[in-house]
């Protein structure tokens, strides 16, 4: 049999694909909710890309108490780098939405476009990754972490001990993962 050619779909996954088979148990309401959630995730990705471009181009947005506007304008005002990967190993890295380190002050800002309440732990991990990658002692620098969500700004000045503990856990867990990989 000669199968139909669908090479244009290589690497893509359908919303109702076989590998995502859970949809066969959905009712109409669950399907609608799941679809809307997927669309919100895609919109969030597009908004992050838009924010990145605005920051790179230093294009401020109108001064309004809107999540995206506040995030972009603050990142530009603090001369931050958008979408910066913070790397410890292939087992542990992440992308900070906006970051800068100047005058011994680490700033990390995170844009949240969804409705699920964000948690500062993600930014604590970014701060730990920064300290590990750039060999900074958490107790020797100042840190301000911000989450922009729901037209609000949530600010945290983390305890350096917490950042150090997360960093130690990253190092320990990375060694454990590498040991398991070598045993395979």
Give residue spans per PLM region:
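Nucleic-acid nuclease catalytic cores
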Residues: 86-168
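Accessory terminal regions of nucleic-acid processing enzymes
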Residues: 175-184
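Metal-dependent nuclease catalytic cores that hydrolyze phosphodiester bonds in DNA/RNA
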Residues: 1-95
């Amino acid at each position: 049999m000669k199968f139909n050619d669908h090479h244009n779909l290589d690497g893509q996954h359908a919303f109702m694909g076989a590998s995502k088979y859970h949809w066969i148990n959905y009712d109409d309401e669950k399907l609608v909710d799941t679809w809307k959630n997927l669309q919100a995730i895609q919109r969030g990705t597009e908004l992050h890309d838009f924010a990145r471009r605005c920051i790179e181009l230093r294009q401020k947005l109108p001064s309004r108490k809107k999540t995206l506007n506040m995030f972009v304008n603050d990142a530009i005002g603090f001369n931050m780098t958008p979408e910066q990967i913070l790397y410890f190993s292939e087992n542990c890295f992440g992308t900070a939405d906006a970051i800068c380190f100047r005058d011994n002050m680490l700033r990390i800002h995170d844009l949240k476009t969804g409705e699920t309440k964000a948690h500062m732990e993600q930014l604590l991990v970014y701060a730990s990754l920064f300290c590990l990658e750039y060999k900074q002692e958490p107790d020797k620098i100042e840190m301000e972490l911000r989450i922009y969500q729901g037209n609000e700004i949530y600010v945290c000045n983390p305890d350096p001990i917490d950042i150090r503990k997360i960093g130690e856990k990253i190092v320990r867990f990375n060694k454990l993962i590498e040991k398991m990989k070598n045993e395979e």
